[in-house]
Amino acid sequence: MKRYIITGCSRSGTSVTHNALKGHPNVSALNDEVLIEPYFNMGLSTFTHGRNLKIENEKGFQAIFDGICSIGANEDTEYIGLKTSLYYYPIYAKYVTSALEKYFPNIKVIITYRKDTVAQYGSWIRARKTGQYHSWNKKDKKLLHPIKLNKYQYIKQLLDNLDFMEELRNLNLTHDVLEFSYEDDICKGNFYKLFDFLKIPYYELDWLNSKKVAPSPKKYIKNYN
């Protein structure tokens, strides 16, 4: 079975992209998001005291990946994969790229990104305030009054995200990479690009029941402009 990974900055569409692939009949993917730390910087040492043999370290990353991502695999499975998103710590992007470059030379990489960085930051703040991070978590219907973003915190996250994306885009030099846009692909339903990238058959995404929960950014971000 072949491997893929979905990664990108937080609130850039990693989850809906993950769900679009996870439901495909030829894909087996771990349901939840994988923590960057400890897996991507420690590998097998996540479970040991670190006294691993060289061959264990070399094969440990792949063994863990294959083990957790193939739980739902069957005779139709062609790809196994996972998703992880970047937030808070700029070193996290380096953990991901280093692991992929060293241990996963043939993995397919899907990078999500968002052009509207104000909306991206506002989405993160709104999710934290409401506790509702995804549109398929319908148990929490709390509404949020319009919010005002802290421009200094926004600038910090913007700079962090630029660093994240610069590091991730280095993978274009070593891997087969698809950049998947929130505005141009996700919002327009262009999920066929994911299937084309992995060379798997196209299916109508009847398993994708996500609906937009938040109003448009201009409606709930007071200082959007």
Language-model segments: residues:
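N-terminal start-of-chain detector that recognizes signal peptides
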Residues: M1, R51-K54, I80-T84, Y152-Q153
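Residue-level preference for the first positions of well-ordered beta-strands
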Residues: R3-I5, E78-G81, V177-L178
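Loop/turn-to-beta-strand initiation segments
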Residues: D76-Y79, K108
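PAPS-dependent sulfotransferase catalytic domain
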Residues: T84-Y202
